[in-house]
Amino acid sequence: MESPNKMLRVRTQHPIISIVNGVLVDLPAPSNISYYWNFGSLLGLCLVIQLITGIFLAMHYCPDVSLAFDSISHILRDVNHGFMLKYIHANGASLFFLCVYIHMGRGLYYGSYMKMDVWNIGVIIYLVMMLTAFLGYVLPWGQMSFWGATVITNFCSAIPYVGTDVVQWIWGGFSVSNATLNRFFSLHYLFPFLIAGLGVLHILSLHTAGSNNPLGIDSNIDKVTFHVYYTYKDLFGIMVLSSILVILCYFMPNVLGDPENFIQANPLVTPVHIQPEWYFLFAYAILRSIPNKLGGVLAMVFSILVLLLLPFIHTSKLRALTFRPLGKIAFWFLVADFILLTWLGANPVEEPYIMIGQFASLFYFCYFLVLVPLLGWAETTLLRMK
């Protein structure tokens, strides 16, 4: 049996194991972080699950317009445990985005965006995730896949002067075709590895800047080692997430999908209502709330990029919303607004959904551009009053 000293020496001095040790074992972590800090490790788990299931699915998938739909059927019916691979991959993507939204919400609530490098890399990861998920949604080559690809890629035609050329360049022709499916499959296979690389940068920059905590104050004098205090906490979160994923995949595998995608893509028949997956619906609702095409596209893009402005428009002397009652109220209004926009995105483009969507979109941008700086200034002023 090896002595503890030798084990410690290997753990801390080995060129590769020491990196893992610094991330998972001896990492100094604030002593008061809550379960909201679990979602970083859960996102790592989701990414690994998506990579493994995606690689195995790619072994049986055919990126050809005449074979793609049938190859999905082949995976479900003929491949050993193929149905589990497909449903874990599809529902795993939903849980991935759910964890991302909670992770980002925690960052907004506790002011984690003040660590700019960590936050900016996180926003870039989110953008690449959205692109990857969109590319993957096209691959089953069902009706919603085909028409979703047609509608979303057509937004690029709103770019002045070169829009039409850009769309045809993306399509590889004059419509969504075999060339489109091929390049979407190729990029969908590539981007998760890019996300993994950005994830490593995210973790490295986090360890350089140090973790935030629920109080939003410097915690350098009160830290504990990551193992054993938070590894077991993370394991509990992993068990809960795994249980939810297994229940989804076995008992309701298609609950988050669209029935239209059980019909093979037909360029001659348009679905009654075209909509993306649930995790894009808030941005889709913002896009549709503006009647001008270019304006809608800009609003949709800016709804994500506005997150990059947060470190510059934070005016409060307090980082977290823990001790900011006005900021707390505004934040929970934002959460309600996000849920409302998600619901509106799944509804048809008609009244009263259009008008409600316009008000909800207006509040979304007002929160970031008006309420965050205004309430920060107001609360700081009130704190200084004697």
Swiss-Prot record:
The entry's keywords: Electron transport, Heme, Iron, Membrane, Metal-binding, Mitochondrion, Mitochondrion inner membrane, Respiratory chain, Transmembrane, Transmembrane helix, Transport, Ubiquinone
Cofactor: heme b
Gene3D superfamilies in alphabetical order: Cytochrome Bc1 Complex, Chain C
GO biological process: mitochondrial electron transport, ubiquinol to cytochrome c
Pfam families recorded: Cytochrom_B_C, Cytochrome_B
UniProt record similarity statement: Belongs to the cytochrome b family.
Function of the molecule: Component of the ubiquinol-cytochrome c reductase complex (complex III or cytochrome b-c1 complex) that is part of the mitochondrial respiratory chain. The b-c1 complex mediates electron transfer from ubiquinol to cytochrome c. Contributes to the generation of a proton gradient across the mitochondrial membrane that is then used for ATP synthesis.
Name the UniProt record assigns to this protein: Cytochrome b
Organism of this sequence: Sarcophyton glaucum
Lineage of source species: Eukaryota, Metazoa, Cnidaria, Anthozoa, Octocorallia
Gene: MT-CYB
